[in-house]
Swiss-Prot record:
SUPFAM superfamilies (alphabetical): NAD(P)-binding Rossmann-fold domains
Pfam families: Epimerase
Any one GO molecular-function label of the UniProt entry: aldehyde dehydrogenase (NAD+) activity
A GO CC term assigned to this protein in UniProt: cytoplasm
Gene3D superfamilies: NAD(P)-binding Rossmann-like Domain
Gene Ontology biological process terms from the UniProt entry: cellular detoxification
Protein name: Uncharacterized protein C2A9.02
CDD domains xref list: SDR_a7
Organism: Schizosaccharomyces pombe (strain 972 / ATCC 24843)
Protein family (similarity comment): Belongs to the NAD(P)-dependent epimerase/dehydratase family.
Amino acid sequence: MRIFVTGAAGFIGSEIVRQLLEAGHEVVGLVRSEENAAKLRAAGGTPYIGTLEDLDTLKKGVAQCDGVIHTAFVHDFSIYQEACKLDARVIEAIGEVLRGTERPLITTSVTAVLSSNGKLGTEISEVPQPPIPRQLGEVTTLKFASQGVRASILRLPPTVHGAGDHAFVPMLINVAKNKGVSAYIGNGMNCWPAVHRTDAANLFVLALEKETAGSIYHAVAEEGIPIKEIAGMIGKRLDIPVISVSSEEATEHFGFLSSFLSVDNPTSSILTQQRLGWKPTHSTLMTDLASDAYF
């Protein structure tokens, strides 16, 4: 198949591109710059210059292809709600092109749309009300599943790890370096699920090839890692004290990260593994943190 990939130059998207090409697919990748276009060409893909905001150009690219994997997202947490609204508009535009074609569309969401109260979330768990902003993209995706699009959702955990990661864990490491301590909130027993980037990319490819319209998949290799353990490994690697901060102190210490660090989001992928035959095999988060990939 000829697959249109948004975020093709990203941390996860670039690995998806590699695996799609390895599986014999053609890739047309949405990229913003000539620099990223050159990288995509070198990998064997075809660059398509555009942005998420330019929906007309995006739709023309989608129309050339047999399916879509949408991973791009504006990761600017100062405008998070607007980024989620843009994500929904992008999915709407893609869905309009694919409507009635029975072509596959895999969109990206997050496990945090599920409850953050420590209850194990599954692929069939109900989303709590009111939903978080990221749920907008899920609602839009599922709408097209009943309109002749093989649309499904792949939820990523807060920690998609591996060499080149620049998300929450590297941010925590930078906070620890700047503060001289590695901290967690309260007793630190709230959990984040995790997955290695290579395993996550593999799930996108499997979902593209095997998915059923309206499905939700979880790219989760580890159901829940206590934040205290993550902070402990960071402290060990940086040779700095590991401390607890109160919820009142958390915002001053972590900034915007405090709201994410307070989430208790254990998540299962048992149904995903059963339905798609997905088996995560790569290193765990703590193994990666013990290596030189992050330090």
